UniProtKB/Swiss-Prot annotation:
Disulfide bonds: none annotated. It is an enzyme of class 1 (oxidoreductase). This is Hydroxylamine reductase. GO terms for cellular component: cytoplasm. It comes from Vibrio atlanticus (strain LGP32) (Vibrio splendidus (strain Mel32)). [2Fe-2S] cluster binds at C3, C6, C18, C25. Keywords: 2Fe-2S, Cytoplasm, Iron, Iron-sulfur, Metal-binding, Oxidoreductase. The lineage of its organism: Bacteria, Pseudomonadati, Pseudomonadota, Gammaproteobacteria, Vibrionales. NCBIfam families: hybrid_clust, PRK05290.1. It is found in: Cytoplasm.
């Protein structure tokens, strides 16, 4: 086992990365090795899918499936070895199918097949018990004994960035949004990484290519969400519970939430969001359901306690999943799509009757709690509508600075930085927030500036697209570049979606971003220096010192 993709990976003066019987996330060495085999096999799939486009061979089924399978290897998504084996076996079947199609088409048009990469020749045995023996060939740090650590680090930056983009591609696909040009670019990059490249400049350029591709993917996902559910509107959400039977929906998949709301109408079941599903309340086509009762709990790292105390059924639609056996709620948990845990019921299709039956069999909440409201729904359209008023307040000197404080949450004590930072931000500043990092401070009171709330919840992690649109609009209004705006990004990272959003911001030319709580373990000192020199990336220190530096600029 070797895994170094998330923030909680082992980091000591002598060891970087999880390489023992179990990772810090709870992933076993077996699952980790199987995921490596799957990823390397997917690189082979992309070799033939990319080559196929030169021969007019496009397999839509493969295009739509491959990013989904890649998503299954993202942090805290799928811990079930049987499911990973299924993905791996399917990838091998697709690779063989594509190879046959491409070779046949190449013969017809006289196209010469280039030299095959190792990934293109990576064949899986029919006996699944033999898959683990291939793990050394597929390890994400393969070649580390002969390659410079900077090369390995950049390969991983690209791999993890592309993995984050693949997750957003799958979220968009579920909502009917696909683009052949993006599929082609995804396969091109994935196939390139399967060649084990060693040119530093080429790898750096590829990381920027991934960032720009992800910008288009986030735009696509934004369209899918707003076309399907309407544009988010500022909406108050109750973060306390109501008496009655209940279902909790966690993850990111708004499609699943809608289906659950439709199927629970009139059944006396309250539906609650959790974690990154909180922004769902801002969408008119979801908020119209009166039994969408509120948001329960906070960020992912608290779920074992919060889920254990939830007296109903729980549906995990995407990341982040933790071991449900710790809180003894595995019998009330259902996984969807790419999510998996051994022994937990997995649902395919759109029939949630098993979830409903489970919810009705539980006692539910016994009484109503006193309501506590927070506001969400400041998505792209709402921000654009508010832009003229915001500009006016800036011109009048009432708003002097904007902070975007968000990203992934986690359980390290250093993450209290983000709570303290927002609390100490000047009262003439506006704070935009997104992703689950918001739970560090979104129940605090920030007041308003002449009717403009000082805290604006933009949405899920992918809604960084909305924040970017606001920054572009403000830069146009003030006739300056984004980096000249009184705007500072203070981001927290945990997994691969955060990595690709950072690459997107870099690719768009955004500089001076503060990141934390720690640097990714796969980035060497040399690579961190490159990011500091090229993009003015800064590591967080203390809220007091960072605010002093920011406001003095």
């Amino acid at each position: 086992m070797f895994c170094i993709q998330c923030e909680q990976t082992i980091q000591t003066p002598t060891v970087k990365g999880c390489s023992f019987a179990q990772g810090m996330c709870g992933k076993t060495s077996e699952v980790s090795d199987l995921q490596d085999v799957l990823v390397h096999s997917l690189q082979g799939v992309s070799f033939w899918a990319s080559l196929g486009r030169a021969c007019d061979v496009i397999d839509t089924e493969v295009d739509e499936w491959a990013p989904k399978a890649f998503f299954a290897t993202l942090t805290n998504v799928n811990f079930d070895p049987a499911r990973i084996i299924e993905f791996a076996q399917q990838s091998h079947e697709f690779k063989q199918r594509l190879e046959q199609k491409v070779r046949a088409a190449a013969t017809l048009i006289g196209f010469e097949i280039p030299e095959l990469s190792a990934a293109a020749q990576f064949d899986l045995p029919t006996d699944s018990s033999e898959l683990l023996a291939l793990a050394p060939q597929a390890a994400v740090n393969r070649g580390h004994d002969s390659q410079h650590e900077d090369v390995i680090g950049l390969r991983l930056l690209c791999l993890y960035g592309l993995k984050g983009a693949a997750a957003y591609m799958e979220h968009a696909r579920v909502l009917g949004q696909t683009d052949d040009a993006i599929f082609a670019e995804y396969h091109e990059i994935m196939a390139f990484l399967g060649t084990d490249p060693s040119d530093l400049k080429q790898l750096l350029d590829t990381s920027m290519q991934i960032g720009l591709m992800n910008y288009k993917v986030m735009e696509m996902l934004d369209k899918g969400e707003t076309d399907t559910f309407g544009h988010p509107q500022p909406t108050t959400v109750n973060v306390k519970t109501k008496k009655g039977h209940c279902i909790l929906v966690s993850g990111h998949d708004l499609h699943d939430l809608e289906k659950i709301l439709q199927q629970t109408e009139g059944k006396g079941i309250n539906v609650y969001t959790n974690g990154e599903m909180l922004p769902a309340h801002g969408y008119p086509e979801l908020n119209k359901y009166p039994h969408l009762a509120g948001n329960y709990g906070s960020a992912w790292q608290n779920q074992q306690k919060e889920f254990a105390n939830f007296p109903g059924a729980i549906v995990m639609t995407s990341n982040c999943l933790l071991n449900p056996d710790v809180g003894s709620y595995a019998d009330r948990l259902f996984t969807r799509s790419i999510v998996g845990w051994p022994g937990v019921d997995h649902l395919e299709g759109d029939d949630f009757s098993a979830v409903i039956d489970c919810a009705l069999a539980q006692e539910g909440f016994k009484h109503d709690e006193i309501e506590q409201m927070i506001t969400v729904g400041f998505g792209r359209n709402a921000l654009m509508e508010a832009a003229p008023a915001v500009v006016e307040q800036v011109k009048e000197g009432n708003i002097k600075h904007f902070f975007l404080v968000g990203g992934c949450d986690g359980d390290k004590s250093e993450r209290s930085y983000y709570t303290d930072f927002t609390a100490q931000a000047p009262e003439d500043s506006v704070i935009l927030t997104l992703a689950c990092g918001k739970f560090r401070f979104n129940k605090n009171q920030f007041g308003d500036i002449n009717g403009i709330p000082r805290l604006l919840d933009v949405g899920q992690c992918n809604d960084a697209y909305s924040a970017i649109q606001l920054a572009i609009a403000l830069s146009q209004e003030f006739d300056c570049g984004i980096n000249e705006l009184p705007l500072t990004l203070v981001l927290s990272w945990f997994e691969q979606k955060a990595i690709v959003i950072l690459l997107t911001l870099f690719a768009l030319g955004v500089k001076g971003i503060y990141t934390g709580p720690t640097a990714p373990a796969f980035l060497t000192e040399n690579l961190l220096k490159i990011m500091q020199d090229e993009f003015d990336m800064r590591s967080i220190s203390t809220p007091e010192q960072d605010l002093k530096t920011i406001l003095a600029a």
